[in-house]
Swiss-Prot record:
PANTHER family to which the protein is assigned, alphabetical: FLOWERING-PROMOTING FACTOR 1-LIKE PROTEIN 1 (PTHR33433)
Biological process (GO), any one: regulation of flower development
Name this protein carries in UniProt: Flowering-promoting factor 1-like protein 3
Similarity comment: Belongs to the FPF1 family.
Stretch list, region Disordered: 16-36
Domain of life: Eukaryota
InterPro entries named in the record: FPF1
Disulfide bonds: none
Amino acid sequence: MAGVWVFKDGIVRRVENPGSEESSSAGDGGGGGRRKVLVHVPSGEVVASYEVLERRLRELGWERYLTDPCLLQFHQRSTVHLISVPRDFSKFKLVHMYDIVVKTRNVFEVRDAAAPAVSPAT
């Protein structure tokens, strides 16, 4: 796992190709130029909107907080975890995707947008 850890705007994240970070598009977060997507593994569904994300998180017992006007926040009573994402889906970046992956083990994963869909194991 190669890369550089970058601290920017109060967030620590791993950048695979630090030289291309400034020229990368908003959705890939510096991941080598390929666009990434968040995938709900059990269904194979790509999270293309916050409606999809919220539905899948609710299925797992996450509840939405309605207090912050700039963020969508989700909390699970059985843990101390808090998922925070920008209210504007166009600002949903790779660092937010990996935050969700870490806090919902084996339920979501980040894939290349062009990668073929993998059918869920039965």
